[in-house]
Protein backbone atom coordinates (compact mmCIF):
# COMPACT_ATOMS: atom_id res chain seq x y z
CA UNK A 1 0.00 0.00 0.00
CA UNK A 2 1.43 3.35 -1.03
CA UNK A 3 1.56 6.43 1.18
CA UNK A 4 -1.33 8.43 -0.30
CA UNK A 5 -0.27 11.64 1.43
CA UNK A 6 3.12 11.37 -0.25
CA UNK A 7 1.55 10.50 -3.60
CA UNK A 8 -0.82 13.47 -3.54
CA UNK A 9 1.97 15.87 -2.59
CA UNK A 10 4.15 14.56 -5.43
CA UNK A 11 1.29 15.00 -7.86
CA UNK A 12 0.35 18.49 -6.68
CA UNK A 13 3.96 19.68 -6.78
CA UNK A 14 4.30 18.52 -10.39
CA UNK A 15 0.84 19.86 -11.26
CA UNK A 16 1.74 23.37 -10.11
CA UNK A 17 4.97 23.19 -12.14
CA UNK A 18 3.35 22.20 -15.43
CA UNK A 19 3.44 24.59 -18.38
CA UNK A 20 -0.28 24.53 -19.19
CA UNK A 21 -3.50 22.57 -18.70
CA UNK A 22 -2.62 20.21 -21.54
CA UNK A 23 0.52 18.83 -19.93
CA UNK A 24 0.32 15.25 -18.68
CA UNK A 25 1.43 14.78 -15.06
CA UNK A 26 2.49 11.32 -13.91
CA UNK A 27 4.24 12.13 -10.62
CA UNK A 28 2.76 10.24 -7.70
CA UNK A 29 0.12 8.38 -9.70
CA UNK A 30 1.94 5.50 -11.37
CA UNK A 31 1.27 1.96 -10.22
CA UNK A 32 -1.69 2.82 -8.01
CA UNK A 33 -4.48 0.38 -7.28
CA UNK A 34 -8.12 1.40 -7.76
CA UNK A 35 -8.51 1.73 -4.00
CA UNK A 36 -5.46 4.00 -3.82
CA UNK A 37 -6.75 6.09 -6.73
CA UNK A 38 -10.07 6.49 -4.93
CA UNK A 39 -8.17 7.67 -1.86
CA UNK A 40 -6.35 10.19 -4.05
CA UNK A 41 -9.66 11.54 -5.38
CA UNK A 42 -11.00 11.87 -1.83
CA UNK A 43 -7.86 13.47 -0.38
CA UNK A 44 -8.65 16.73 1.48
CA UNK A 45 -5.72 18.52 -0.18
CA UNK A 46 -7.72 18.63 -3.41
CA UNK A 47 -10.37 20.75 -1.64
CA UNK A 48 -7.94 23.53 -0.77
CA UNK A 49 -8.29 26.78 -2.76
CA UNK A 50 -4.66 26.72 -3.88
CA UNK A 51 -5.25 23.36 -5.57
CA UNK A 52 -8.48 24.32 -7.32
CA UNK A 53 -9.00 22.26 -10.50
CA UNK A 54 -6.24 19.82 -9.55
CA UNK A 55 -8.85 17.14 -8.88
CA UNK A 56 -10.20 17.13 -12.42
CA UNK A 57 -6.66 17.17 -13.83
CA UNK A 58 -5.84 14.18 -11.63
CA UNK A 59 -8.76 12.23 -13.05
CA UNK A 60 -7.76 13.06 -16.61
CA UNK A 61 -4.13 12.11 -16.01
CA UNK A 62 -5.32 8.75 -14.69
CA UNK A 63 -7.35 7.99 -17.82
CA UNK A 64 -5.79 5.39 -20.11
CA UNK A 65 -4.02 7.21 -22.94
CA UNK A 66 -5.94 5.62 -25.81
CA UNK A 67 -8.32 2.93 -24.59
CA UNK A 68 -10.52 5.12 -22.40
CA UNK A 69 -13.97 6.67 -22.48
CA UNK A 70 -15.60 9.36 -20.37
CA UNK A 71 -19.37 9.83 -20.51
CA UNK A 72 -21.30 12.85 -19.29
CA UNK A 73 -25.10 12.87 -19.27
CA UNK A 74 -25.22 16.24 -21.07
CA UNK A 75 -22.26 16.17 -23.44
CA UNK A 76 -22.01 12.47 -24.24
CA UNK A 77 -18.91 10.36 -24.72
CA UNK A 78 -15.29 11.42 -25.23
CA UNK A 79 -12.54 8.94 -26.08
CA UNK A 80 -8.83 8.93 -25.22
CA UNK A 81 -6.99 10.93 -22.56
CA UNK A 82 -6.23 14.02 -24.62
CA UNK A 83 -9.73 14.43 -26.07
CA UNK A 84 -11.14 13.99 -22.58
CA UNK A 85 -8.65 16.57 -21.28
CA UNK A 86 -9.51 19.02 -24.04
CA UNK A 87 -13.18 18.99 -23.07
CA UNK A 88 -13.33 18.23 -19.36
CA UNK A 89 -10.83 20.70 -17.90
CA UNK A 90 -12.20 23.81 -19.68
CA UNK A 91 -15.76 22.72 -18.87
CA UNK A 92 -15.06 22.25 -15.17
CA UNK A 93 -13.39 25.66 -15.04
CA UNK A 94 -16.46 27.18 -16.68
CA UNK A 95 -18.75 25.68 -14.03
CA UNK A 96 -16.42 26.03 -11.05
CA UNK A 97 -19.32 27.44 -9.02
CA UNK A 98 -20.73 23.89 -8.87
CA UNK A 99 -19.68 21.66 -5.99
CA UNK A 100 -20.00 17.88 -5.94
CA UNK A 101 -20.92 16.66 -2.47
CA UNK A 102 -20.84 12.91 -1.66
CA UNK A 103 -24.21 11.47 -0.62
CA UNK A 104 -23.08 7.92 0.19
CA UNK A 105 -19.77 6.18 0.92
CA UNK A 106 -17.73 5.22 -2.13
CA UNK A 107 -17.37 1.53 -2.98
CA UNK A 108 -14.80 -0.68 -4.70
CA UNK A 109 -15.52 -3.84 -6.70
CA UNK A 110 -12.55 -6.10 -7.45
CA UNK A 111 -12.74 -8.70 -10.21
CA UNK A 112 -10.16 -10.96 -11.86
CA UNK A 113 -9.59 -8.74 -14.90
CA UNK A 114 -10.45 -5.26 -13.63
CA UNK A 115 -11.63 -3.16 -10.71
CA UNK A 116 -14.59 -0.77 -10.55
CA UNK A 117 -15.51 2.05 -8.20
CA UNK A 118 -18.75 3.80 -7.30
CA UNK A 119 -19.37 7.36 -6.13
CA UNK A 120 -22.77 8.92 -5.42
CA UNK A 121 -23.03 12.69 -5.17
CA UNK A 122 -25.20 15.77 -5.45
CA UNK A 123 -24.36 18.95 -7.29
CA UNK A 124 -24.80 22.35 -5.63
CA UNK A 125 -24.52 25.73 -7.31
CA UNK A 126 -22.62 27.87 -4.80
CA UNK A 127 -22.88 31.66 -4.90
CA UNK A 128 -21.42 33.16 -1.76
CA UNK A 129 -23.38 31.77 1.17
CA UNK A 130 -26.13 30.42 -1.08
CA UNK A 131 -26.09 26.72 -1.96
CA UNK A 132 -28.67 25.83 -4.59
CA UNK A 133 -29.34 22.07 -4.82
CA UNK A 134 -29.01 20.55 -8.28
CA UNK A 135 -29.52 16.92 -9.41
CA UNK A 136 -27.98 13.94 -7.70
CA UNK A 137 -25.75 11.68 -9.74
CA UNK A 138 -23.53 8.64 -9.83
CA UNK A 139 -20.03 7.96 -11.14
CA UNK A 140 -18.94 4.44 -12.08
CA UNK A 141 -15.33 3.92 -13.16
CA UNK A 142 -13.44 0.91 -14.49
CA UNK A 143 -9.70 0.47 -13.82
CA UNK A 144 -7.20 -1.74 -15.61
CA UNK A 145 -3.45 -1.76 -14.83
CA UNK A 146 -3.61 1.45 -12.81
CA UNK A 147 -5.56 3.50 -15.36
CA UNK A 148 -9.23 4.40 -15.79
CA UNK A 149 -10.61 2.87 -18.97
CA UNK A 150 -14.21 3.96 -18.50
CA UNK A 151 -15.89 6.66 -16.44
CA UNK A 152 -19.64 7.26 -16.66
CA UNK A 153 -21.43 10.10 -14.88
CA UNK A 154 -25.21 9.60 -14.93
CA UNK A 155 -27.70 12.18 -13.67
CA UNK A 156 -31.04 13.67 -14.65
CA UNK A 157 -30.58 16.63 -16.99
CA UNK A 158 -34.29 17.40 -17.51
CA UNK A 159 -34.35 20.31 -15.05
CA UNK A 160 -31.29 21.84 -16.71
CA UNK A 161 -33.14 21.94 -20.04
CA UNK A 162 -36.14 23.90 -18.73
CA UNK A 163 -36.53 27.67 -19.31
CA UNK A 164 -35.28 29.85 -16.48
CA UNK A 165 -37.23 32.68 -14.80
CA UNK A 166 -36.41 34.98 -17.72
CA UNK A 167 -37.54 32.39 -20.27
CA UNK A 168 -34.04 31.58 -21.49
CA UNK A 169 -32.85 28.01 -21.95
CA UNK A 170 -29.33 26.82 -21.15
CA UNK A 171 -27.05 26.54 -24.17
CA UNK A 172 -26.45 22.81 -23.94
CA UNK A 173 -26.66 20.10 -26.59
CA UNK A 174 -29.56 17.70 -26.97
CA UNK A 175 -29.63 14.35 -25.20
CA UNK A 176 -26.48 12.46 -26.28
CA UNK A 177 -26.75 9.25 -28.27
CA UNK A 178 -24.19 6.55 -27.49
CA UNK A 179 -24.04 3.07 -28.96
CA UNK A 180 -23.62 1.30 -25.63
CA UNK A 181 -22.02 -2.14 -25.70
CA UNK A 182 -24.36 -4.61 -24.04
CA UNK A 183 -23.04 -6.97 -21.37
CA UNK A 184 -24.62 -10.31 -22.21
CA UNK A 185 -23.32 -11.88 -19.00
CA UNK A 186 -26.33 -10.19 -17.38
CA UNK A 187 -29.73 -11.38 -18.67
CA UNK A 188 -32.13 -8.85 -20.15
CA UNK A 189 -35.03 -8.02 -17.85
CA UNK A 190 -38.54 -7.11 -19.00
CA UNK A 191 -39.53 -4.50 -16.43
CA UNK A 192 -43.25 -5.27 -16.54
CA UNK A 193 -42.55 -8.88 -15.56
CA UNK A 194 -40.91 -7.90 -12.26
CA UNK A 195 -42.24 -9.85 -9.28
CA UNK A 196 -42.70 -6.78 -7.09
CA UNK A 197 -43.79 -8.78 -4.06
CA UNK A 198 -40.68 -10.95 -4.20
CA UNK A 199 -38.45 -7.94 -4.83
CA UNK A 200 -39.83 -5.93 -1.95
CA UNK A 201 -39.45 -8.70 0.62
CA UNK A 202 -35.73 -8.01 0.23
CA UNK A 203 -36.17 -4.45 1.60
CA UNK A 204 -35.91 -3.77 5.31
CA UNK A 205 -39.46 -3.38 6.69
CA UNK A 206 -38.83 0.10 8.11
CA UNK A 207 -35.19 1.17 7.68
CA UNK A 208 -35.10 1.24 3.90
CA UNK A 209 -35.32 3.89 1.21
CA UNK A 210 -35.77 3.79 -2.54
CA UNK A 211 -34.84 6.88 -4.55
CA UNK A 212 -36.02 7.76 -8.05
CA UNK A 213 -34.70 11.00 -9.62
CA UNK A 214 -38.13 11.99 -10.95
CA UNK A 215 -40.59 10.56 -8.43
CA UNK A 216 -38.66 11.13 -5.22
CA UNK A 217 -37.99 9.04 -2.12
CA UNK A 218 -40.02 6.19 -0.66
CA UNK A 219 -39.32 5.01 2.89
CA UNK A 220 -40.07 1.56 4.26
CA UNK A 221 -41.01 -1.68 2.54
CA UNK A 222 -44.75 -0.96 2.29
CA UNK A 223 -44.32 2.46 0.68
CA UNK A 224 -41.69 1.13 -1.72
CA UNK A 225 -43.91 -1.81 -2.71
CA UNK A 226 -46.97 0.38 -3.24
CA UNK A 227 -45.13 2.75 -5.55
CA UNK A 228 -43.20 0.10 -7.48
CA UNK A 229 -46.39 -1.89 -8.12
CA UNK A 230 -47.98 1.07 -9.86
CA UNK A 231 -44.86 2.38 -11.55
CA UNK A 232 -43.61 -0.89 -13.02
CA UNK A 233 -47.06 -1.88 -14.26
CA UNK A 234 -46.81 0.96 -16.76
CA UNK A 235 -43.56 -0.40 -18.21
CA UNK A 236 -44.86 -3.63 -19.76
CA UNK A 237 -42.87 -3.31 -22.98
CA UNK A 238 -39.69 -1.87 -21.48
CA UNK A 239 -36.60 -4.08 -21.39
CA UNK A 240 -33.59 -3.36 -19.19
CA UNK A 241 -30.38 -4.28 -20.98
CA UNK A 242 -27.10 -4.38 -19.06
CA UNK A 243 -24.31 -2.17 -20.40
CA UNK A 244 -21.88 -3.24 -17.70
CA UNK A 245 -21.22 -6.22 -15.45
CA UNK A 246 -23.19 -6.99 -12.31
CA UNK A 247 -20.94 -5.58 -9.58
CA UNK A 248 -21.14 -6.52 -5.92
CA UNK A 249 -18.81 -6.50 -2.93
CA UNK A 250 -21.20 -8.04 -0.43
CA UNK A 251 -22.49 -4.74 0.95
CA UNK A 252 -23.10 -2.73 -2.22
CA UNK A 253 -24.16 -3.69 -5.74
CA UNK A 254 -24.21 -1.71 -8.97
CA UNK A 255 -25.71 -2.30 -12.39
CA UNK A 256 -25.35 -0.02 -15.41
CA UNK A 257 -28.17 -0.35 -17.94
CA UNK A 258 -30.21 1.11 -20.76
CA UNK A 259 -33.98 0.93 -21.10
CA UNK A 260 -35.36 -0.05 -24.49
CA UNK A 261 -39.02 0.09 -25.51
CA UNK A 262 -39.69 -3.08 -27.52
CA UNK A 263 -42.87 -2.94 -29.61
CA UNK A 264 -44.87 -6.11 -30.46
CA UNK A 265 -43.48 -5.90 -34.00
CA UNK A 266 -39.93 -5.96 -32.60
CA UNK A 267 -39.23 -2.26 -33.17
CA UNK A 268 -36.77 -0.96 -30.57
CA UNK A 269 -36.68 2.59 -29.18
CA UNK A 270 -34.01 3.81 -26.77
CA UNK A 271 -35.51 5.38 -23.65
CA UNK A 272 -32.73 6.22 -21.20
CA UNK A 273 -29.33 5.25 -19.81
CA UNK A 274 -29.19 4.52 -16.12
CA UNK A 275 -27.33 3.10 -13.15
CA UNK A 276 -28.85 1.26 -10.19
CA UNK A 277 -27.29 1.04 -6.74
CA UNK A 278 -28.30 -1.14 -3.80
CA UNK A 279 -26.82 -1.26 -0.31
CA UNK A 280 -27.59 -3.89 2.33
CA UNK A 281 -27.15 -4.44 6.05
CA UNK A 282 -26.19 -8.05 5.43
CA UNK A 283 -29.79 -9.25 5.48
CA UNK A 284 -32.02 -6.62 3.89
CA UNK A 285 -31.72 -3.91 1.27
CA UNK A 286 -31.58 -0.65 3.19
CA UNK A 287 -30.89 1.68 0.28
CA UNK A 288 -31.70 1.56 -3.42
CA UNK A 289 -31.31 4.33 -5.97
CA UNK A 290 -31.95 4.48 -9.68
CA UNK A 291 -30.12 7.18 -11.61
CA UNK A 292 -31.23 8.02 -15.15
CA UNK A 293 -31.83 10.96 -17.45
CA UNK A 294 -35.54 11.72 -17.75
CA UNK A 295 -34.80 14.21 -20.54
CA UNK A 296 -34.51 11.35 -23.02
CA UNK A 297 -37.90 9.86 -22.15
CA UNK A 298 -40.73 10.45 -24.68
CA UNK A 299 -42.82 12.41 -22.17
CA UNK A 300 -39.94 14.66 -21.11
Protein language model features and the residues they cover:
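C-terminal and inter-domain tail/linker signature
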Residues: 1-300
